[in-house]
Amino acid sequence: MRLLKFVCLLASVAAAKPTPGASHKVIEHLDFVPEGWQMVGAADPAAIIDFWLAIERENPEKLYDTIYDVSTPGRAQYGKHLKREELDDLLRPRAETSESIINWLTNGGVNPQHIRDEGDWVRFSTNVKTAETLMNTRFNVFKDNLNSVSKIRTLEYSVPVAISAHVQMIQPTTLFGRQKPQNSLILNPLTKDLESMSVEEFAASQCRSLVTTACLRELYGLGDRVTQARDDNRIGVSGFLEEYAQYRDLELFLSRFEPSAKGFNFSEGLIAGGKNTQGGPGSSTEANLDMQYVVGLSHKAKVTYYSTAGRGPLIPDLSQPSQASNNNEPYLEQLRYLVKLPKNQLPSVLTTSYGDTEQSLPASYTKATCDLFAQLGTMGVSVIFSSGDTGPGSSCQTNDGKNATRFNPIYPASCPFVTSIGGTVGTGPERAVSFSSGGFSDRFPRPQYQDNAVKDYLKILGNQWSGLFDPNGRAFPDIAAQGSNYAVYDKGRMTGVSGTSASAPAMAAIIAQLNDFRLAKGSPVLGFLNPWIYSKGFSGFTDIVDGGSRGCTGYDIYSGLKAKKVPYASWNATKGWDPVTGFGTPNFQALTKVLP
């Protein structure tokens, strides 16, 4: 029976992969049908698919050199962030490169009206039959065995050798979407005594029982400071998975916790069919959490909720075995939208409280989106991400068919061009919260800006957890903030929310306050934060040396499926940088003294 199943599996894989011709080069391939999916038959030749094609840059170092030049204090170009037109010029491929790709598409049968040249990206729509010929592949219908959702995908695709050096990736092809991408969100019921506390009592509590804007202001030294209303200091809040920020809940929150901010609101940026529906039974907790703390801590800043339709492309692993039918790629949709905005419409801070295990995304996809975060950084955007809520890992095993024991880094927190925010709990002193994710990337090498700090930590760590992580990978998180039991109004009622999804918007608001401080003195916004944080800014953060993260318990915390167990798996908070709280939590007054 086992032999028969193995033979059938080989047959299905063979049916999904045509024999590559000598004139074509394979761009991407999967070794097997992802776990939880079954190939059920050939795709309808007339079915239409919308594709993204990322053009491989001839000199990728130009982008990286530029972001470090404008983001590293002491360099001549520091703070001289690019305009959109300057970024376009930096990334624009040679005319003959774009022409060769467009000619390949049109000669292959794609209607020229369905092709959009966006410089370093090309978007095109065509039917399955034409796409199969173009990419020397066979598209099939794959069914999710758990929820019967079907998708048109392939396990491998190629392009002509003549243009292969110019193609970084084409998607959706090998991307199998998820229904519930990992996000940081833990709900806690509130006791009646907490619900009845006054603003003054919350401030005096120093976040010991419930986190509010009042106690964060006290704990992190903001006092009653607010940002000024300026066009050059905007905050963007990312919304995915049909999460909608509710105006009525924000009004209730501000009335209760920030009375001086009553009447302040946010605008909407709706991307790729995104919505921000008010009322109704849909989920809104994450969106409300983000918006209430961003507006509450910096209420005069211009805040935009960027709602993007669609669900992300992931390769199934134990943490997220269920799939979705939406073909949109939300990060790509959002990021391509943002990098095309004029500089005066861009947020100076963008906070996002979503993430996926790094291994569950194809390598080409993580590289392409990480580069887009870098592009935002060159234009002066501080990109903030929550680090995740699984400690060193949840499933703690690889999804490459080997099922090897391995810690699970989180993406985009592991991208070297974002600032990753871990979580703390308690006061006097603050401690690392046990769920705060962190670790070392398996995709991105450690950037030079964090060499010294991470090497110091690795000396302390020694051989502990050897083989379970890549010590040469990009280390995260970078910094941290309170992450346990935030007061949030949702559907008219107050609840408690925990997770690094709470830490990220709180930190974003504090960064906006620092930008406001700099702008008032005639200096530009901070932009990409990490080179400053690791060179000098770290001294403005309170080092967290107590507590630690936990994970790898033998069961995946999201799916409940049995997984690898690593006894006592953890990252401990230590003196200096560590992979659970980074450099620690902000002290606003101290930070203003070490600004570049």
Curated annotation (Swiss-Prot):
Cross-referenced Pfam families: Peptidase_S8 (PF00082), Pro-kuma_activ (PF09286)
Cellular component aspect of the GO annotation: extracellular region
UniProt-annotated location(s): Secreted, Extracellular space
Name of the top EC class for this enzyme: hydrolase
Residues bound to Ca(2+): 543-544, 576, 578
Signal peptide: 1-16
The entry's keywords: Calcium, Glycoprotein, Hydrolase, Metal-binding, Protease, Secreted, Serine protease, Signal, Virulence, Zymogen
Residues annotated as catalytic: 286, 290, 501
EC number, as in UniProt: 3.4.14.10
Known cofactor(s): Ca(2+)
Superkingdom assignment: Eukaryota
Propeptide span(s): 17-203
InterPro entries: Peptidase_S8/S53_dom (IPR000209), Peptidase_S8/S53_dom_sf (IPR036852), Peptidase_S8_Ser-AS (IPR023828), S53_propep (IPR015366), Sedolisin_dom (IPR030400), Tripeptidyl-peptidase_I (IPR050819)
Domain named Peptidase S53: residues: 210-596
Glycan-linked positions: 265, 403, 572
Main location: secreted
Function: Secreted tripeptidyl-peptidase which degrades proteins at acidic pHs and is involved in virulence.
Classification via PANTHER family: PROTEASE S8 TRIPEPTIDYL PEPTIDASE I CLN2, TRIPEPTIDYL PEPTIDASE SED3 (AFU_ORTHOLOGUE AFUA_3G08930)
Name of the molecule in the record: Probable tripeptidyl-peptidase SED2
Organism listed in the record: Arthroderma benhamiae (strain ATCC MYA-4681 / CBS 112371) (Trichophyton mentagrophytes)
